[in-house]
């Protein structure tokens, strides 16, 4: 008896979790459950679906990718997400990471600058993760209307922490994403906003090296010297 399409994708999701995530110290049961359930193949073009669960990133638009499954899981686990928290996903693309956070019980605002990617993401979340509210606009200003947030999640790489984060993050809130200092390999980071006598500051933790393109508008500014 041949497999149905539903069975085929369900098996692919289970293999992804069991062969890629669990051996790589992804232990949060909510993340594993969400990624066993969410149809990642709906976040890419039909011609890419056969590779949707492979250990690779997949191009979505110039300079934009659907992150490899393990990177998404590592970022979500680094975020220490809690049900009921409010999260902003910056560079939400076609909605997969936003969907994972929503399946973990977070109330998610998804911000995307590319209208076509956002349309795919909205359709994906409407079918699979209703607790996601979408907005289209520049990434470098955040989304103050829905803040402040417990978590700001960059679904990609930044050159530095954007200025908007301190105003839109709650005290004790977290930033998660990849950061690439000039000339360095990107690193997964978590930054917690803490209060000090000198004012609010971030406490940084750098977790592991990874690869992801710089998000539009969040690249480091070029430095010129005479």
Residue ranges: model-predicted function:
Residues 1-90, 96-100, 104, 117-126, ...:
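Class I SAM-dependent transferase core
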Residues 80-206:
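Conserved nucleotide-cofactor-binding alpha/beta core module
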Residues 226:
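Catalytic, metal-anchored helix/loop core of enzyme active sites in primary metabolism
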């Amino acid at each position: 008896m041949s497999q149905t399409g539903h069975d085929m994708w369900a098996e692919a999701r289970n293999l992804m979790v069991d062969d890629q995530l669990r051996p790589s110290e992804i232990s949060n049961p909510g993340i594993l459950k969400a990624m066993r359930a969410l149809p990642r193949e709906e976040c890419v073009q039909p011609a890419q679906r056969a590779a949707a669960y492979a250990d690779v990133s997949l191009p979505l638009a110039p300079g934009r990718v659907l992150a490899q499954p393990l990177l998404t899981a590592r970022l979500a686990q680094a975020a220490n997400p809690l049900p009921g928290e409010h999260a902003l996903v910056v560079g939400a693309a076609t909605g997969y990471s936003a969907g994972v956070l929503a399946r973990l019980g977070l109330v998610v605002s998804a911000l995307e600058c590319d209208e076509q990617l956002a349309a795919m993401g909205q359709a994906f979340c409407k079918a699979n993760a209703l607790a996601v509210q979408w907005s289209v606009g520049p990434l470098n200003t955040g989304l103050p209307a829905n803040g402040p947030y417990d978590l700001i999640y960059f679904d990609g790489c930044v050159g530095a922490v954007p200025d908007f984060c301190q105003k839109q993050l709650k005290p004790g809130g977290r930033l998660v994403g990849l950061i690439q200092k000039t000339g360095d390999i990107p690193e997964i980071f978590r930054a917690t906003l803490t209060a000090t006598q000198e004012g609010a500051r971030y406490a940084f933790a750098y977790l592991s090296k990874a690869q992801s393109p710089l998000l539009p508008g969040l690249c480091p500014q070029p430095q010129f010297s005479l």
